[in-house]
């Protein structure tokens, strides 16, 4: 059977259209970019309540990815550094959201009960602790290691993303001499000044996503 050129063109166009749709579906969600609006998300906290980023519109927000078995995270909690930051800045009106994005069965995953126990053990006081076992929020913000930090300004734009400081070690003593990027960003925003360092590479333990 002869197939006309017109018929072949229609088939080709249909194939291209299907391919385009498949590719569009396969494209991952956009990740956060410094200076651009922070990607919106919702996640359940450790009480089962759904928390939306938009709930905190107009406020400065810190996103802190954590892992209770990571020595790099342990450095900042065992030294009391992370708790001190949480207390200082939440008292000043900053919203501090701690997140766990490792998949079930992977190192770093926590149940609500385990997350509550971690907060009690560390005497941590974030605004909330969000659970992200499917990794949706972590991928949106390209979180790859713990601790991974993001600062969002009052206009809803990403002001800083990356490491907590400039000293990638597990030594508690290094906290005192390290330059803390999160502190610098928050203080600059509070003073109405531009953030000097807006992006760094996070160091620490890798976040174990479900398909990686």
PLM region descriptions:
Residues 2-11:
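Bacterial N-terminal signal peptides that target proteins for export
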Residues 10-20:
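Bacterial N-terminal signal peptides
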Residues 20-40:
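N-proximal helix/coil linker or "cap" segments that precede and/or mark the start of modular domains
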Residues 39, 124-127, 143-150:
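Structural micro-motif
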Residues 41-61:
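A short beta-strand-turn-helix
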Residues 55-74, 186:
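Short active-site neighborhood of thiol/selenol oxidoreductases, capturing the structured segment around
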Residues 74-122, 132-140:
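Structural microenvironment flanking redox-active thiols in thiol-disulfide oxidoreductases
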Residues 151-212:
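Thiol-/selenol-based redox modules, centered on thioredoxin-like
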